[in-house]
Amino acid sequence: MKRIVCLALFLSMTGCTTLEPIETPAQENATTVVDAVEGDKAAQESSGIIDTLRDRTDPIAGDPAWAPINPKKKQEHYAAATGSLFNANHIGSMYDDSKPRGIGDIITVALDENTRATKKANADMSKSNDASMEPLAVGGENLELGKYNFSYDLSNTNTFAGDASANQSNSISGYITVEVIEVLANGNLVVRGEKWMTLNTGDEYIRLSGTIRPDDIDFENTIASNRVSNARIQYSGTGVQKDMQEPGFLARFFNVSL
């Protein structure tokens, strides 16, 4: 008992019992590279009961996440200050135009994507079991119990055959012009852009974002889509034609239930 009293007195004198709990700062949501390029999809809200039933939110033209960047002033050199008037990062050739290297510069991307995947699997399995026993014989005669003897003959066969195949192909070609939204420390350019086309019963759009090397841009200020790193290409549409290509709410509900 004396030890407990002494320990309590010691803690009260040292002030350990009056220490306030350390407050841990709340976790801050950082902006990822994907959010910076494509926008935060978690912040998108449904436009009504139609989008709720369709289980999707259609993109809109003029989305701030895809808005162009218009610099208010000329960007400074992205190379470290060395005191020299010569900058190796801005060397131009006598036979081509100056290449985009700053925020807001425009680059044309030639879309030429062809992908194809084929998969096929076959499975055949079989198993058979046989078991038998001759009648018991005692003294040269079969041992019987009424009409039955002690013999049996069992056989079992299990077979399974499965065949699965999948074939998928995608192709897109065309052009889209994008803008530089960021210049990385190594000189690579982060680009982003979209194109909207209004049709009779809806809109079609193409969106592209990714990272490119200035050296891959040709003399026509064009770069192939297969030269874009971390490329995200979207080609879809909105409106009646888009809705007709998807099953309705009840069809999706019963398919999930089954």
Swiss-Prot record:
Biological processes annotated in GO: bacterial-type flagellum-dependent cell motility
Lipidation (S-diacylglycerol cysteine): 16
Topology with respect to the bilayer: Lipid-anchor
Cellular compartments annotated: Cell outer membrane; Bacterial flagellum basal body
Keywords: Bacterial flagellum, Cell outer membrane, Lipoprotein, Membrane, Palmitate, Signal
First and last residue of the signal peptide: 1-15
Lipidation sites (N-palmitoyl cysteine): 16
Record keyword Signal present: yes
GO cellular component assignments: bacterial-type flagellum basal body, distal rod, L ring; cell outer membrane
Family annotation (InterPro entries): Flag_Lring
GO molecular function, one term: cytoskeletal motor activity
Pfam families noted in UniProt: FlgH
Keyword Nucleotide-binding annotated: no
Database matches in PANTHER family: FLAGELLAR L-RING PROTEIN
Oligomeric and partner information: The basal body constitutes a major portion of the flagellar organelle and consists of four rings (L,P,S, and M) mounted on a central rod.
Function in brief: Assembles around the rod to form the L-ring and probably protects the motor/basal body from shearing forces during rotation.
Record-stated family: Belongs to the FlgH family.
Protein name in the entry: Flagellar L-ring protein
Source species of the chain: Vibrio atlanticus (strain LGP32) (Vibrio splendidus (strain Mel32))
